[in-house]
């Protein structure tokens, strides 16, 4: 069996100019980055402002196993499938982070015959966006410490600096550090830490900005610390929002690539869904909607994380209205939630028990009044009996379900799913967010935890309660909520599989992302700098004398 990278390397890519032609782009609408990549100019949105938007389809998933359930693969396969049946469809995806690429998950460009290419480039650096985001973020960090060293005119309280440094890598050693050691010439000694770039507020801002000037304004509004009188200090107080924005002048432009079947894909931004808001950029999604009849996008991890944030944060802030939600499920993941000892062996009992997880995610998505279609991402270990079992279960609940073979067959494996998505997207979608912004921070958090996570009670630490009051007193109480929690469970406890309910969910800390425009609630001891596993994927990656990469996935 060929690996994903072997399949990708055998693909005949079309030059990016030809892909751009399929979108009716002119030479002035994009800038080429080599033969197979391009940046799309922001001016395109103004050029197409009078063009009607296409339909918006969100792809999400049930609670995954550590290896993931193929959400990106189905997103890409569905896009290829729609194009195969004559529809103009474009995928709008996130860019992979180097952290999981070298960590436990490997590359994040889909799999099998449903991938985006050039796969190696996209997984490794791509067009430099994440480096630009890291640089802009760390410029702010450097200026904060320099300001303190140079006299601290703003009277920054060094114990109340809330802006960390970032690195696009899993590195647990950087979670808690001391900086400024070695004498006064090296600055002021203080405790600090790093977070992974994809959890950075600058990443979130890039993905939630509508223009370059909007980006600059949002960066300026980031609260990086509090002064000795506990007043908030913003990046614009350091007068460096313009400098940070200049580092992002190209990164803000969405990237154009292609699938293995040479259909257009727009890739931009990459916030994680467990420790950030988990969606690609507003700009990329809006461009795709103008350039296609069907935009297929995804949100990270399961529906309780990425999809909830897509629907309650991104759609609300961008004025987007999804027409259909595709919920990806795998038989192996359902058996995992049902307590199977070996998910690669037929186990109807475990599969049936695992339906509780599937049903909970379906129920959650239906709360937003958007049509839902279930896609079963087929694995070779799935048996006919298991497929029949899950099909009957969904049909008994009146849910459209489709067996997807996009890994093995590419777009051909998503023909049935494509037709079901077209049908669902043609139905009336009365999308509405889960909660009203005017509710208190506590009420909004409790609504998500009880409605989406099925918690019986939400317990707030004293630190969290104090910060909630502070945020409301500062006038930010009407912002949407971004809960950071484990992706391994619907709850805040990774050990609670399937569909736990009635438990107590713990909110440890509350943070304000004043630039991005949301409030972060940290649940269940989640951390924003992952670590590497005992044997990271990096150990399997190599390159030969001709520059050919192997082992990426």
Curated annotation (Swiss-Prot):
One GO term of the biological process aspect: tetrahydrofolate interconversion
Pathway participation: One-carbon metabolism; tetrahydrofolate interconversion
EC number, as in UniProt: 6.3.4.3
InterPro entries in the cross-refs: Formate_THF_ligase, Formate_THF_ligase_CS, P-loop_NTPase
Binding-site residues, ATP: 65-72
Keyword entries, A-Z: ATP-binding, Ligase, Nucleotide-binding, One-carbon metabolism
Disulfide links within the chain: none
Catalytic activity: (6S)-5,6,7,8-tetrahydrofolate + formate + ATP = (6R)-10-formyltetrahydrofolate + ADP + phosphate
A molecular function GO annotation: formate-tetrahydrofolate ligase activity
Highest taxon above the source species: Bacteria
Membership in a protein family: Belongs to the formate--tetrahydrofolate ligase family.
Record's protein name: Formate--tetrahydrofolate ligase
Gene name, Swiss-Prot/TrEMBL: fhs
């Amino acid at each position: 069996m060929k690996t994903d990278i072997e399949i990708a390397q055998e693909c005949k890519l079309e030059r990016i100019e030809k892909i751009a032609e399929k979108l009716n782009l002119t030479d002035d609408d994009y800038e080429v980055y080599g033969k197979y990549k391009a940046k799309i100019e922001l001016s395109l949105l103004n050029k197409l402002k009078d063009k009607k938007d296409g339909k918006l389809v969100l792809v999400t998933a049930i609670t995954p196993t550590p290896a993931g359930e193929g959400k990106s693969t189905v997103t890409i396969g569905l896009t290829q499938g729609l194009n195969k049946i004559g529809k103009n469809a474009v995928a709008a995806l996130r860019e992979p982070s180097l952290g999981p690429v070298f960590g436990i998950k490997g590359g994040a460009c889909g799999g099998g015959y449903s991938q985006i290419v050039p796969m190696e480039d996209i997984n490794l650096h791509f067009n430099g966006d994440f480096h630009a985001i890291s640089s802009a973020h760390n410029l702010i960090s450097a200026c904060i410490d320099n300001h303190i060293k140079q006299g601290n005119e703003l009277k920054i309280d060094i114990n109340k600096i809330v802006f960390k440094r970032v690195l696009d890598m899993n590195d647990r050693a950087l979670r808690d550090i001391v900086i400024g050691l070695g004498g006064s010439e090296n600055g002021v000694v203080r405790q600090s830490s790093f977070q992974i770039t994809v959890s950075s507020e600058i990443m979130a801002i890039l993905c939630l900005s509508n223009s370059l000037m909007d980006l600059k304004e949002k960066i300026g509004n980031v609260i990086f610390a509090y002064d000795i009188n506990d007043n908030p200090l913003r990046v614009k107080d350091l007068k460096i929002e313009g400098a940070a924005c200049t580092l992002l002048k190209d990164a803000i432009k969405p990237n154009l690539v292609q699938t293995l079947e040479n259909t257009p894909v727009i890739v931009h931004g990459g916030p994680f869904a467990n420790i950030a808001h988990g969606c690609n950029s507003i700009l990329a999604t809006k461009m795709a909607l103008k350039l296609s009849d069907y935009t297929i996008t995804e949100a990270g991890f399961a529906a309780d994380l990425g999809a909830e944030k897509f629907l309650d944060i991104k759609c609300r802030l961008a004025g987007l209205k999804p027409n259909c939600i595709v919920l990806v499920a795998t038989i192996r993941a359902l058996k995992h939630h049902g307590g199977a000892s070996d998910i690669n062996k037929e186990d109807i009992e475990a599969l049936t028990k695992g339906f509780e997880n599937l049903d909970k995610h379906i129920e959650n998505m239906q709360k937003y009044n958007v049509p839902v279609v279930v896609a079963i991402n087929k694995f070779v270990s799935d048996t006919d009996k298991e497929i029949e079992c899950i099909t009957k279960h969904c049909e008994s609940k009146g849910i459209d379900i489709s067996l997807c073979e996009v890994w093995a067959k590419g777009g051909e494996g998503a023909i049935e799913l494509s037709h079901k998505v077209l049908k669902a997207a043609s139905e009336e979608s009365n999308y509405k967010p889960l909660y009203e912004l005017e509710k208190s921070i506590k009420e909004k958090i409790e609504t998500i935890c009880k409605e989406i996570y099925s918690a019986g009670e939400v317990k707030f630490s004293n630190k969290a309660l104090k910060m909630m009051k502070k945020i409301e007193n500062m006038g930010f109480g009407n912002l949407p909520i971004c809960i950071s929690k484990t992706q391994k469970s619907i709850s805040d406890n990774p050990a609670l599989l399937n569909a736990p309910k009635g438990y107590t969910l713990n909110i440890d800390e509350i943070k304000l992302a004043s630039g991005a425009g949301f409030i972060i609630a940290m649940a269940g001891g989640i951390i924003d700098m992952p670590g590497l596993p005992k044997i990271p994927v990096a150990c399997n990656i190599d390159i030969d004398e001709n520059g050919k990469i192997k082992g990426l996935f």
